[in-house]
Each structure stands twice: as structure tokens, then as C-alpha cells.
Amino acid sequence: MKAYLALISAAVIGLAACSQEPAAPAAEATPAAEAPASEAPAAEAAPADAAEAPAAGNCAATVESNDNMQFNTKDIQVSKACKEFTITLKHTGTQPKASMGHNLVIAKAEDMDGVFKDGVGAADTDYVKPDDARVVAHTKLIGGGEESSLTLDPAKLADGDYKFACTFPGHGALMNGKVTLVD
């Protein structure tokens, strides 16, 4: 039986090698849709700390999130010179918010654990406890392809160390960073 399989394999290889058809170009050999997960597109595979969301006299920043539970920044710089500062959260992934939803919540660093714990039971309010005084500002929970914005007074950030995080259960350990007041 082994000899029979070996003979058939050799015949198939021989016929394929002697084919009159030219070899397919390398680009066609592995379509992008069939690439393994480890070869994810650069936008989703970029390290979360690769960029800062700069203030630079600008009173707005954009933070992107993806299906890999990553923000594209670990530091949001807020200018003291701004009367209001707007942060837009864009979910660049495709997963729905029920399974891979993201929000952006700002609170003092020492309050963030409590914000997470209280948010777990608040699915109806985007995993943020209603009227939580520890929360400076937050976006709504969004799914792939959606965006949401928050606006805050930079003066609220003057008295301590602040963090931002996603409060969707289980996401905060990976999806967090600092909010830095600059200028």
C-alpha cells in the first residue's frame, strides 16, 4: 500500500512539474484573505504604545481602537490652553459592540480600579456606573466602524494623575494609558 501511495505521489508531482502552464506569480499564491493571523495588517498589529495623541496647540485628539483590544496610543496630551478638549474614539475593527465593544473613560489613576469594578454591572450604561463622580468624562460604547466623542474642561485634569481606559469587561488591563496635561 505504501509503495502504491508513493508511486501515485511521484506521478502527481511529475505531471505538475511538466505542466505547460507558467507558475503563478508570488502575489497570487497567497491571497491576503488567507494570511495567518500573525500577519495581521499593520494598522491592527501596530504596538499600542507606538504613538501619542498630541495636543500641539490643538484642542482635539483621535484615539483608535481595534479588534485586538488595543488603543493606538498610551498617552493623550491635553493642552492647558484649551477651554474645551475633545477626544474622538474610532473603532477600526469589524466586531460588534456586544462582543468587542470599546469605550474611553477618563478618571484619576487611583480611582480607575473602582471605576472598572462598578462598571462591570453597568452594561446598560456602556459599562460606566451612572453619575460616577470619579469619571471625568467618557464616550459611549462602540463597535467596529463606529466612533464616539467626549469633551472635557482641561482644568479638571490639573490636580492629579489621570488615566484613560476601556471599561468593557476584561479590556482595561490592555487598553489603558495616561492623560497628560501639557503647555
From Swiss-Prot:
Q: What is this protein called?
A: Outer membrane protein H.8
Query: Superkingdom, according to UniProt?
Result: Bacteria
Q: Which residues carry the N-palmitoyl cysteine lipidation? A: C18
Keyword vocabulary terms for this entry: Cell outer membrane, Copper, Electron transport, Lipoprotein, Membrane, Metal-binding, Palmitate, Signal, Transport
Task: Report if keyword Aminoacyl-tRNA synthetase is assigned.
Answer: no
Residues annotated for lipidation of the kind S-diacylglycerol cysteine are C18
| Signal peptide residues on this chain, from the entry's feature table | 1-17
**What binding details are noted for the cofactor?**
Binds 1 copper ion per subunit.
The record's annotation in InterPro entries points to: Azurin (IPR014068), BlueCu_1 (IPR000923), BlueCu_1_BS (IPR028871), Cu-binding_ET (IPR050845), Cupredoxin (IPR008972)
